[in-house]
Amino acid sequence: NFLMKKHIKILKKKLKSFNPRLKEECGIFGISNTKDASALTALGLHALQHRGQEGCGIVTFNGKQYFSEKRFGLVGDNFNKEKVLKNLQGDHAIGHNRYSTTGENTLRNIQPFFADTNAGGIGVAHNGNLTNSISLRNKLVEDGAIFYTTSDTETIVQLIAKSKRVKTIDKVVDAIFQIQGGYSLVML
C-alpha cells in the first residue's frame, strides 16, 4: 500500500508538468514477480508517456486469473487511484501507451490485448510496425478468424491462437517467425 500511495502521489505531481503536445509512438512496459505490479507498471508507463497520448492499458495476472483496465487519456489521469490499481491484482503486469499508427482510435484498439487459447490465457502488448500485417490478417480471415479490433497487434494474438503447437511459448515462437517488420513485444 505504501508503494501504491507513493506512486499515486508521484503521478499527480508529474501530471502538472506534462506536455500533451509531445506525440511519438506507443510505449510498452512489463514487470514480473513483484508486489504492486500494477502500480509499478503505471509508473513505467508514465515514464514512457511522452511516446503516446491517446490511451493506455494494463493487464495483470495473479497466477490464476487475468485482470485488464484500458482507457482513453493519459496514464496519470487513469491509473492514479488506489481503487483502480487494486482491481488489477497480481504480481505480473504488462502495459501499453497508445498513439495509433495503424488501426482506428477506439477503446477496443487500446492494448494490452488478452485472449484465451487452447494452451491458456495470454496478454500481449506491441510497439512498432508489422510490415506484413495486412496480408497476415487477410489470410487469417480467409481461414475463419474473427477480428475484434483494427490493430495489427491482434494479428499477433490470432497467430498465437491459431498455432498448432502445444505449449504457449512454442505458439509465440511460431507466430514471431511469421511476422515481419520492426517491433517490440511484452507478453504475459
Q: For the regions a protein language model found, what residue spans apply to each?
A:
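Conserved short alpha-helical segments that host acidic/polar catalytic motifs at enzyme active sites
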Residues: 3-188
